[in-house]
Structure formats: structure tokens, C-alpha cells
Amino acid sequence: MTKKRKHQEDFQKVKLKVGKKKPKLENATDTTFKTKAIQIPEQLKEDGMLTTQNRKLNIKDLLSQMHHYSPGVKQNALLGLKDLLSQYPFLIDAHLSNIISEVAAVFTDKDSGVRGAAVHLLQFLASKIRAEQIAPFFPLVSAHLSSAMTHISEGIQEDSLKVLDILLEAYPALLTDRSSILLKNFVELISHQQLSKRLKSKEKLSWMLSVNPNRRVTSQQWRLNVLIRLKKFLQAVVDGSNETEDEGLQEQKDSPHSVRNPIFISWKVHANNQQHIHLYENGGLRPKMSSSFRLRSLASVMDSAEKGLSSAENLKGFIEIIIPLLIECWIEASPAQSAPILGNLLESDCQQLMQQVLSIIHLLWKLTKRHDETYKMEVWLRMNYLVDFKHHFMRNFPYSLQETVKHKKKDSCKGNKYCTTSSNNVDHLLLNLTLCDIMVSLASASTLQADSGWLDMIRNFVTDTLQDGSRLNSKQVNRLLGVTWRLMQIQQNKVATEPLIKAVYTLYQQRNLLFPVRTLLLKFFSRVYQKEDSKTQRIRSRSKVLSRWLAGLPQQLALLGLRNPELSNQLIDIIHSAASRSNKELLQSLQATAVQIYDPLGGTLVLLPAEAQRRLVQLVYFLPCLPTSLLACLSRCCIMGRMSSELAATLIGILRMRSSFAGWKCQVQDNAVNDVDYFSFLFSTLIGFSREELTSLQGIRGKPHISQTQLSPVRLYLTDLDQFLHHWAVTEVICHSLSTIPSQSQCFDILQTGICKYLVGLVVIPDSTAGSVLCAINKLLDQACILSENLHKFLASCCYSLLYFLLTLDKEDAEHVQKRDMLWGSCISALALLPRLLRLMLQSLQVSRICREELPVVAQLLRLLMQHGQLRSHMMTNEFLVQQIIKDIMTLKSGEVQEQWLTDLHYCFNIYLASHPQGPSPMNAVY
């Protein structure tokens, strides 16, 4: 076989017959295997939480679709992103950087649908993201907003205002920090630079209003939309300033950044070293910073261009640009020269534009007052803009709104000065008041003669508005009072100021004024009064209207009551300020209405909160005199519990200072309290109940209100714990006041006479009254005092009734258990000071008249009296009486099994009395 044939045999294909299987090779691999199906009912939960409701796209997919070329895909991505974030809010914090950057990037998208979806998403995010969270990304947001505001497309510019609204509402402080760029954008939205060959310097390029016919709205409406946002932006700048003011109603202080923090000092607490007084701002361990300066890091130091309106140079530059543009807007909207002069009627749209123009100027004027050299700034404003303002603004002053009037009657407009009313949220009165506020800020006392013409117009308008009687809102009244105050500062003679004060008082006398309006009027009058009172006596000229207003404040306070606590607090502050200055008219009025204010049933004192009560109590010190009727009211206020015991103590201390027993070394003022009335007040407050209340208690019988015993004619009325504790605290203060009276014997005689006249003979006496009487006796008793027989018997009956009540008291009665220490101490002290009192009480223990159930109580009382160290000697003196009482008890218990209490009584008698131990034992009674 040839070599060629052998070679072909190696590559010859084996032909298999049909139906025959191919034989397996020797080195073949078995590839057969078995499988089972795996069912996955749902995806992983983590991935499921990242999907939207329908499209199963997570947040990364949605953010990536924001770069798609199709507007529909981007719009759907924004809508899906809003749905996803509303369903899973925690994704906002995790992907905040990407979300903010992608949403801000579509502010300048060409498609309006995409921009609208972005605005809705931004509105949603603003309610979820805090200012400190978005602060690191806000420069990026501000840059995209600036690009949108200066975009060539009109639609993008219009939508940028919507974005601006959201950011102004949610993050005003962050937005105003970048005011230098945004203010220029506002200017470019309504104007363009006027290029002229005659202008050689580029720094003096002027601006003129632009007209774009391609916009969907008119040029005037577009300017109105932009100016509304500019006003909001400037308002945010003003609000973000450290210095705050109230439209000229706040007082000018030596330090504009000073803060008043009054400190309430309790001398009782201070005397015990429990309260430390810091007289100065940084007197504490931690200094309290009250500064207008804010510390910044070196990396954030800004140059003058980045300071925005906080720089006087930048503020002047912006005013020079915007004021001419605002004047052009005003000229377009102002009435035509050929229009009738009657009322200077304005269309609604024109009036809105004029209102925004004046509001922006007013805010700029406020910003000029925030700088150090305010006077120089005012001179600069007057020199540059007074002529234009007089020519354009004051020419048709005052302005009113033109409306379509249905002529149903021929004389329908006779009763109205301007024949117009406000509608469509247009406030023509606020327009006029804003103009007045701007103009009066350009005037001063030195320029009064030159400005007298237009100042008289403003003064007449303000006076007519105040006297018109129409209902004014708080914003109008605030601006109105600011103008009034400025007019009074420009011309300070009484001839000019008195009509203005009278006009304000006419408005103040109206009924049903809103609370903010009433508050503003009170602040105005208070400031006028303080300004007038600060003048020296030589140049002071009292305003009759102001005196009439001050005289009416106490009566208003008495009638107001609890209907408006905030207004009552303001009235109290003003009354207190005038009373401390010894204003004659106010003190006379306060004296006349004092009984109504301090009425214990429905007076202002008992109705208002604790802080207001404290201020009213302090007013008592300034009253010219304190008659009997007023002292009776004050006594009832102290004991009724409608004010705290600490405040009652303050009131008692004030009355002591106004009495002849104050201990002044020199005569500082006439004694406002009669001595008889003063003692009557102290005694009535000590008793704690009026005569009518004590009379009504005599008919009460039985438990749980009455504690009675057969051995004492006095029954105890059990008071509530709160009433008892309040009465006891007041009693301690009364006892202290009585102890400061120089003649103690005479004071004791007066107290003894009062007790014998009003208490002796009563069957039912409150437990707090009995304890208070014993406490006062213990405090005032000395060797020169002589007690009458009736008082001795009364006190002995009170002592036994109180001791019987304490010994029969159930330990589970938590309310009355707390009275034990105070009442027990009073009784023991009285028995120790008055040996005859102890003897009378022992003589009254006639056990033959009592029931067997009371015998253990008498035995326990005797045992405790014998064990008490202070009473040991007195009990030994009365040994025969004690022995007789024990013998009577043994007689009643003869023939019976001797009980433990009787054994204890025998033991104590044998130990303490029968054996006559040498010296008093230190053992005290424990029960």
C-alpha cells in the first residue's frame, strides 16, 4: 500500500447505518445531570424599598434618567422621584447631594413641563429638608437659580420666580447671604443697561426699563411680579438683621443692641444664700453674649462685594440703580396728568405696582438705618431723592382705588370722601401710609421750614385717618403710628403734637378694637408719656389728652378682668410705670378704682395669673391712701387662697411699710394706713374667716367636717389641707408683723380684745383659726401681758379640742395628718408659756361626764403631757389634779380587767410625778 493511501485511512469517516447508535469512546465524559425548579416569589426587600409604586425603578435609575435627552423621560423621572421620596422619606438624607444637584440642574431646562415638575419636587423637598442640611449645597442651588433668572428664555425666567418663592419661604437666611448676586439679577429682569457713546466711564452706566413683547404677560404685570419677589427678598434681609424695630415705635436706646432681662429677687431666699444676684450682664459663670457681631472663620472672610446690603457702599450702589427704575415704574402706573383731581383714582393693577414700589423703598430706608453713620445716610438720601419724590409721589397725594360703582342712587358717593373701597387685596390706605413713612424719614427739625408744605399734607392726612373711625388692621395702625411719632419728633411744640395725640386717642376710644391694634396704641401712648416725663420740669408741658388717657387706664383694667390677660398685663405695666413716677392723675384714678381691682370675689387681682398678681400687689405701695374698705378686700384676698401665700406675705409687708410701724428713721411719706385699720387688717387676716363665714359654720354638725368632745365647749371645723397650709403660712407672716410693733403689751391687749369680741362664745371654730390664735399668743406674750379670764377659758378649750383631734386622728387620713406637727407645737408652746392655761385644761377634764370610749384618749393625753420636757414642772405643780383625774378614771374602770393604756398611765405617773425626779428629763413625747 502506498504512503498516500495509508494517509487517507487515518482521516476516513466512519459511515454509520440508520438506527445504529454511535459507539462511545473510551475516554468519553458522562454529562448527564438532574435539576429542580427554584421559585422566587419576590425580590429582596432592600431592593424593593428602593422602587416606586409602578415602574420598579430605584432612586439611582431615576436620577440617571434626569440626563436623558427626552423631556418626557425627565419629567416622568421627576414625578417618580417625588412619589418615591414621599413613600420613603429616609432616602432624602441618604442621597441628598445627588437629589439637590440633579433637581437644581433642570431649573434651566428648555421644556416647561420638566421645569414645572422640578418646581413641584422642590416644594416637596423644602418641607422635608432643614436649613442646616441644605446649607452645604445651597451655593449650587443659588448658582442654578441665578442662571435661570438671567436666562435668555422668557419661560425660564418666569419659572425662576417660582423657585425663588419656595427658597424665600423655606430658607430666607441662606438666600439673603448671597444677596450681592441676586439683587443684580432682579435689576436685569426688568431693565437693561443703557449704552451711550457719551458715557466715557463704564462705572456710570445707567439702567432703563426693558419691554419684551414675547412674554405671555404685559410688561407692567411682569415688573409687578418681579417687584413682589424683590420686596419679599428685601424683607428677608431686614428680618435677618440682628437689630429689630417696630416701625418706629421702639424707643431709641443708648445701645441699640442692649437686651433687658429683668431679675425677680426673693429676699427671703437670698438671705438664706439660696439665690445669687448678678447685677451685670457677664456676672455669672458663663458670660451672656449680647452683641451685634458674629464671628466667622478666616476661610469665610468676605470682601465688600460679597457683603451684600450689609455694606453701606453696596447699599448706596443698589439704591442708585433701583430707585430710578422704581420711579419709572411709578410714572407708568401713576394717574394721567389730565385725569380729574378728585380722589386721584387708581386702577387696581396700577395701585398694586405702586404699592410694591413704595414698599421696596421703605425697606431700603430701613436698611439705611442699620448702619453706623445713619445721619450721613439720611442727608445723602434727602439730597439725591427728595426732589424726585416730591415731584412724582406727592403730586397726587393721597391716592385711592378706582372701582366700578353701580349707581343705584344719585347720592351714593356723598358720604365717602374718595367714593372707593378696597378690593382684590388692595389696600390704598397702606399705600398712602407707606408714602408718608418714606417722606417723613427725609425730614427733620432743621428742615421744618423748607418742608412745611408737604409735611402739612401728611399731617392732615394722618389726622383725618385717625379720626375717620373706620376699622383699621394692625399693619395699617402700625405704619400710621410710626408716621405720627416721626411727625411729633420733627415738630415738638405742643401746638403741633396735641392734635396728633388727640387723633390717636379718638381711635383708642373706639370699641371692639382688635387686640394687636389695642396693643400698638398702648405702646404708642406709653412711649409718648415716657418721652414727655423724661423732660425737665422747666420745659415739661403736660398733654391734657395724655393725662386723660392715663386716668382711664385703671378703670379699663377693672372692666377687662380675665377677658384678655395679655392686654391686662400691658395695662398693668403702663400703670405701674406711671405710678412709680407719681403721676397725679393716674394715682387719683387708681385710688378710685382700687376696690374694684382688688375685689376678692371677681376683681382683677384674683382673676389674673400669678405674675400679673405680683405686679398688682406692688401697685398697692403707690396708692395715696388705704381706706377701710380697701383693706377689707385685701384681707379677703390674702385668706381666700386665690393668690399664693408668698404673694400674700409680700402684700402684708407692703402694708406694714405704709403704716406708722414701718420703723423709718425719717418721715419719707405720710402714713397711708390708719393704725386702727391696720390692726383690723392684721386681725382679720389672722382669723382667716369673715364674720359671715364663722356664723354659717355654727350650724354644721357631725363628721367628717366636725371634731367634737364632751369635755370642751369648742368644736373644730376641719379645713382642707390646702386651705390650712395657706392660712398657716399667712399666720406666720402676720405674727412677724405683730412682733415688730414697738409696744407689745398694747398690741397684745388689742389682740385679746378682738379674740374676746369675735371668737369667744362661738361653738364651732376652724382648726386653722384655733391654731393661728395660739400661734399669735405665743409670739406676743411677755411678762407685761395680762390675760383675761374669758381668754384663758377659751384658749384652754381650744387646746383640749385640738389635742383631742390630734390624738383621735386616723393615721391613714393623709390630709389631716400633715397638720399634726404645727397644731401640736402651738398647743404645747401655749401650755408651757401659760401655766394657768394648763391648770384650766386639767380642771376641765371631768371624766365623769364623758363616755367610756373617750377615757383612753384622756389617759394618753395625760401620759404625753407628763412625758413632755417643757411641761414637766407645770405638771408637777398640778400633781394633785392629775392624781384626782387618774383616781376618777380608776373609779370608772373598777371591777373590770385593767387594760394596757391604764397600766401605762399608772407607770408614767409613778415615774414622772409620784417619785418627784430631780431635774427635767430630756425625753420628748413621741406618738
From Swiss-Prot:
Signal peptide extent: none
Placement of HEAT repeats on the sequence: 99-137
Pfam families referenced in this protein's UniProt entry, alphabetically: Ipi1_N (PF12333)
Keyword presence, Iron-sulfur: no
Purpose: Component of the PELP1 complex involved in the nucleolar steps of 28S rRNA maturation and the subsequent nucleoplasmic transit of the pre-60S ribosomal subunit.
Family: Belongs to the IPI1/TEX10 family.
Record-given protein name: Testis-expressed protein 10 homolog
Primary gene name: TEX10
